Swiss-Prot record:
One of its GO terms (molecular function) is glutamate N-acetyltransferase activity. The lineage of its organism: Bacteria, Pseudomonadati, Pseudomonadota, Gammaproteobacteria, Pseudomonadales. It catalyses: N(2)-acetyl-L-ornithine + L-glutamate = N-acetyl-L-glutamate + L-ornithine; L-glutamate + acetyl-CoA = N-acetyl-L-glutamate + CoA + H(+). The record marks T115, G116 as: Involved in the stabilization of negative charge on the oxyanion by the formation of the oxyanion hole. Its EC number is 2.3.1.35, 2.3.1.1. Belongs to the ArgJ family. The gene is argJ. This is Arginine biosynthesis bifunctional protein ArgJ. InterPro entries: Arg_biosynth_ArgJ, ArgJ-like_dom_sf, ArgJ_beta_C. The keyword Amino-acid biosynthesis applies. Keywords: Acyltransferase, Amino-acid biosynthesis, Arginine biosynthesis, Autocatalytic cleavage, Cytoplasm, Multifunctional enzyme, Transferase. One of its GO terms (cellular component) is cytoplasm.
Length: 405
């Protein structure tokens, strides 16, 4: 059950960006599993992609094409088209070619995305058969339906939207994401699509997305597995009656950057809240590092520890497991006598051992909550990083043991 994640809030339409949904029956008959997105002519597009060496065929194709003119994004669920070799690349290209033919655009202006089971051939004929219905469904107000259409093991659709006013003009930023397992992005299975009607030069848009992703999608982890199919795209349609953003400065850029970051963080945290089998939403904050990287190393050592994650599931304040994870994070010359560890606001460990004021009852009270904070003070410098993760439950094992059945 998703932790603190309710129904979708209002997802504002983005002028110049349309979405259409259809059923191809890839994994289950009747399921809406194909989503087509249409970008207005002249849109600029940015993308960040998985660093997994076995990246999926659609990722390879999208990376090759997104810097050119982009008119359509084609997403299917139920099949990842990963681990499929040259045949997978040909299949992805074939579905793009069919959509391009139906829409009357260049084949290279169609970007493919897939999510689902790895290693199975893409059912090209089923996807092609669903394309006319998806095109007929295109509309600017279909964000919620598209959010549901890209789900796999997700239990709830994920979306976020922000608006701000600049010089009397309303600018919209809206996005959707999917993912619940195989989540440890490095830009899981994670897909994210964000659109704005601001007009933004491609280079500025790319930097804006990369910065937002590094503070959101690249700071979440459920199981430590980086997917073959991770992608996050940011589309700027330019339909808002404002000057083009051509550099990373000025009031319009600052407002847009904040809106994109807020949408990205909400989408990323929604993925964690809906983590497979998750019963806890956990914020791991590491402060006082000499570098940002060592803060991340410590944070991920804690967030990825099966012993800590199972203790979280059991609501067991086993603070020794946290100390052990910090100690094996690989931080050079770590002085444990300077480290303090907190569960919520409760200091559980200080100067290398149990805090003098700590009681088991205090720790148990924090661990019983659905949302838990673990704060680690390294006492080495001024750098900080935050990571969001989950516990590890019986249900996670069950979901993944039965995934292909």
């Amino acid at each position: 059950m998703a932790v603190g994640l309710g129904p979708l809030s209002t997802l504002h339409p983005v002028p110049g960006f349309e979405l259409g949904i259809a059923s191809a029956g890839i994994k289950r008959p009747g399921r809406k599993d194909v989503v087509v997105m249409r970008c207005a002519e002249g849109s600029s597009v940015a993308g960040v992609f998985t660093l997994n060496a076995f990246c999926a065929a659609p990722v390879t194709l999208a990376k090759q094409r997104f810097l050119g003119e982009v008119r359509y994004l084609l997403t299917n669920t139920g099949n990842a088209n990963a681990g499929t070799g040259e045949a997978g690349l040909a299949a992805a290209a074939q579905t793009c070619a069919k959509l391009a033919e139906l829409a009357g655009v260049a084949e290279t202006s169609v970007l493919p995305y897939s999510t689902g089971v790895i290693g199975e051939p893409l059912p090209v004929a089923k996807i092609e058969a669903a394309l006319p219905a998806a095109l007929a469904d295109l509309a600017e107000d279909r964000w919620a339906e598209a959010a549901a259409g890209i789900m796999t093991t997700d239990t709830l659709p994920k979306g976020a939207s922000r608006q701000f006013v600049h010089d009397g003009v309303t600018v919209t930023v809206t996005g959707i994401s999917k993912g619940a397992g195989m989540i440890k992005p490095n830009m899981a299975t994670m897909l994210g699509y964000i659109a704005t009607d601001a007009k933004v030069a491609q280079g500025v848009l790319q930097d804006l997305l990369r910065d937002a992703a590094n503070k959101s999608f690249n700071r979440i982890t459920i199981d430590g597995d980086t997917s073959t199919n991770d992608c996050c795209m940011l589309i700027a349609t330019g339909r808002a009656a404002l000057p083009e953003v051509t550099q990373a400065s000025g009031a319009l850029f600052a407002a847009l950057k904040q809106a994109v970051l807020e949408v990205s963080m909400e989408l990323a945290q929604a993925i964690v809240r809906d983590g497979e089998g998750a019963t806890k939403f956990v914020t791991v904050q590491v402060n006082g590092g000499a570098t940002h990287q060592e803060c991340l190393d410590v944070g991920y050592a804690v967030a990825h520890s099966p012993l800590i994650k199972t203790a979280l599931f059991a609501s067991d304040p086993n603070w020794g497991r946290i100390l052990a994870a910090v100690g094996r994070a690989g931080v050079a010359n770590l002085d444990v006598s300077k480290i303090d560890v907190f569960l919520g606001d409760v200091c559980i460990a200080s100067r290398g051992g149990r805090a003098a004021s700590y009681t088991e009852e205090q720790g148990a009270a924090v661990m019983a909550q659905a949302e838990i904070g673990i704060r680690i003070e390294l006492g080495r410098g001024t750098c900080s990083e935050t990571i969001w993760t989950t516990d590890l439950s019986h249900e996670y094992v069950k979901i993944n043991a039965e995934y292909r059945t």
